[in-house]
UniProtKB/Swiss-Prot annotation:
This is Large ribosomal subunit protein uL15. GO terms for molecular function: rRNA binding; structural constituent of ribosome. Keywords: Ribonucleoprotein, Ribosomal protein, RNA-binding, rRNA-binding. It comes from Citrifermentans bemidjiense (strain ATCC BAA-1014 / DSM 16622 / JCM 12645 / Bem). NCBIfam families: rplO_bact. HAMAP family: Ribosomal_uL15. Residues 30-39 have a biased composition (Basic residues). It comes from the Bacteria. InterPro entries: Ribosomal_uL15, Ribosomal_uL15/eL18, Ribosomal_uL15/eL18_sf, Ribosomal_uL15_bac-type, Ribosomal_uL15_CS. Belongs to the universal ribosomal protein uL15 family. Part of the 50S ribosomal subunit. One of its GO terms (cellular component) is cytosolic large ribosomal subunit. Signal peptide: none annotated.
Length: 146
């Protein structure tokens, strides 16, 4: 076997459809576009969402809600991720970055209660969920809001 003699498996390749190349091809003359009409013209197609002049759906439906300009983007940390730290250690932004739990501080760090914590840890973060506070204190740890 040589590289120049390798052929694809039978039936694995298909000839592409060459349109507008004569009547004998079966796709000549109108080139699969039918007769006349907007879609038969060059560049002729309606834009997405166009409904023939009728008021389109995206304009019939009302606008809703808004995007708050002052929304904070917290780096989220779950309690189950903090199990990698030893008991009694102080966990702050620097420790979380070094361990790879978060990739950046952004607008702050928020600790969420997903999973369980079994070690007593001192956690320094900007925000804590109510259930995360309960779980940390129940495990004998302490919380410091920055």
């Amino acid at each position: 076997m040589q590289l120049n003699t390798i052929k694809p498996a039978i039936g694995s390749t298909k000839n592409r459809k060459r349109i507008g190349r004569g009547v004998g091809s079966g796709h000549g003359k109108t080139a699969t576009k039918g007769h006349k009409g907007q879609k038969a013209r060059s560049g002729g197609s309606v834009k997405p969402g166009f409904e023939g002049g009728q008021m389109p759906m995206h304009r019939r439906l009302p606008k809703r809600g808004f995007t708050p300009l002052s929304k904070k983007d917290y780096a989220l940390v779950n309690l189950c991720q903090l199990e990698v730290f030893e008991a009694g250690s102080v966990i702050d932004a620097e420790a979380l970055l070094k361990s790879g739990i978060i990739s950046g501080v952004r607008d702050g760090i928020k600790v969420l209660a997903t999973g369980d914590i079994t070690r007593a840890l001192t956690i320094k973060a900007h925000k804590f969920s109510a259930s995360a506070r309960e779980k940390i204190t129940a495990a004998g740890g302490s919380i410091e809001e920055i």
